Amino acid sequence: MTYAGDRQILDADSHVMELADFLDEHIDPDQRDRLRRRAMDAFAPLLETAMAGAATRRADTTAATQAEERLLEEKGWLALGAFDPVERTRALDLLGFEGQLVFATFATTMFAGRDVDRLYAGSAAQNRAMVEFCSGDERLYPVAFVPLVEPARAVALATEAIDEGCAAVMVPSTAAGERGPTHPDLDGFWDTLSEANVPFVLHVGGGGRLLDPAFHNNDMPVTDHLGGGENVRSKDYLAIPHSPALFLGVLIYDGLFDRFPKLRGGCIEQGAGWVVSWLRQLDYGQRAFKRTEEPLRELELAPSEYVRRHLKFTPYPGEPVGWMIEQAGSELFMFSSDYPHPEGGKDPLAKFKEALWTTGGDAQRRFYHGNVSELLSGSTTD
């Protein structure tokens, strides 16, 4: 029996845990020496342990069986299939999911920054590496990363990623350099996604620093419970919705979905409880400002209706998903495991099952499968 059991599941969020050489075979030779490799140096002892563990599993069936039994207990690089694509196929067999979107984790730290040449070369290398990681299993859907600071490069990079087989394109949930994300210069990028029937996605970490570190300076230190890699703490959690709520609201208010009615987007690993009140806020904002702002008057639909037609969100395990569906609709929310990241927990299905126990079967099928299918293809069989 798989973890999913007899439930049909598509997973909207999983990750590869990159090794230090993840980009090496894929980056343009003239950019290879410009990667900021020190960004991965802090993980060297853990990577050595993880690689040794994977080698042991390949040589020792008992060790492999033990790892399979701890499938959702081990996290990060220590998890089964964290960086080995053959093991990842086995992990997906055990999970029983029909497919999962696969995001990068740390590779971006090697090329992010103000050096635009390095940024785009590194992004292209990461996209190629993601495609290679997923290439051996059609259930693994690679997610590209495309910065928007240079529109022409963004179009070229998105085109390459889509042609190579990326199932979605992650964009930063920030302004595009000196431009807003709806600037006409970026219409070519949004048109590329729309015409290719490929969604854009936002992901936690894509909006820059969550909050000023001074908010943590309160003489009340807390434990580094995740080991340095992904330390989202309570105050960071409060700030997570700010970036996607603003970015997606700007797309709606500026009429992007009227210009590109086939465009779809997903908001991944940023929670979704905030969406219920955000829908009302969007509609109120239009009513309050449309007299003085022509773009708001020209919208063909209520802002909340664009959300329902074009956007999807992944709740965290433990959020009151049943109530959220009741308040906002069954078409908005998607299951995600975050495998093998620790935020997904050791039993996300149990937490979602508890939150959905009074929710009807059709709405549950949309949550576990149909809405992810709709994000990826524009249609759902549920």
For each of these PLM feature ranges, what is it?
Residues 17, 29-31, 35-45, 106, ...:
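N-terminal-biased segments
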Residues 21-24, 114, 211-216, 277-281, ...:
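Short aromatic-enriched loop/helix-cap "lid" or pocket-rim segments at secondary-structure transitions
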Residues 105-134, 150-163, 179-183, 187, ...:
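Active-site loop-helix segments enriched in His/Asp/Glu that coordinate
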Residues 140-141, 146, 152, 156-327, ...:
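Catalytic pocket-lining loop regions of alpha/beta-barrel enzymes
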